């Protein structure tokens, strides 16, 4: 986590204002036919996540790996009676989200700075949502077990990861031309499509 933080999670927020779209979505956007700009593609992806996670106003929601708060702030605005706890391993991301939540007058957001390898809580949630965070994790079985404990009996877990159709692999720096492993995703993993099923 320390190398990934240095590479991009603790980069100043101003950089991401320039590099990302208006929601500062630090994960996949969705470009269906007719979508022609990044802001709309971010909106499409955020809407799809909420729909697929079956979010509803009044739920207690835990977001694992909240990035720059695109989903956190989106949920806070659309589900004002929900309580949203967002977890990030980045102090600068936490500061940005908390500042934006105050500016937008969202009183239903709490941000926790923690390494997901060690995060735990006694709270119980209706929904646990994770978008492109599990690619940093290694012990999925243990984390799935903790998530199960965090859910109320009829709660649901929604996980979005990028994946390879058949082969999981680690991003290991193998030389000067290995840009992704060296400069952007050191220690990360490309899961295979079926990997989550193997840890149920």
Model-assigned labels for residue ranges:
Residues 58-67:
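Conserved class I S-adenosyl-L-methionine
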């Amino acid at each position: 986590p320390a190398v990934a933080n240095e590479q991009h999670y603790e980069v100043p927020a101003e950089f991401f204002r320039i590099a990302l779209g208006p929601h500062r979505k630090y994960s996949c956007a969705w470009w269906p036919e007719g979508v022609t700009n990044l802001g709309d593609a971010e909106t499409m992806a955020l809407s799809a996540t909420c729909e697929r996670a079956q979010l509803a106003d009044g739920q207690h929601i835990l977001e694992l790996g909240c990035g720059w708060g695109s989903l956190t702030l989106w949920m806070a605005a659309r589900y004002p009676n929900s309580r949203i706890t967002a977890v990030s391993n980045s102090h600068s991301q936490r500061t940005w989200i908390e500042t934006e939540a105050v500016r937008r007058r969202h009183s239903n957001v709490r941000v926790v700075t923690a390494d997901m390898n060690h995060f735990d809580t006694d709270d119980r949630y209706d929904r646990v949502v994770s978008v492109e965070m599990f690619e940093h994790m290694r012990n999925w079985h243990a984390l799935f077990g903790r998530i199960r404990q965090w859910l109320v009996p009829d709660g649901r877990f929604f996980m979005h990861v990028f994946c390879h159709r058949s082969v999981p692999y680690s991003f290991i720096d193998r030389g000067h031309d290995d840009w992704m492993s060296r400069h952007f995703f050191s220690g990360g993993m490309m899961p295979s499509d079926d990997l989550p099923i193997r840890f149920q």
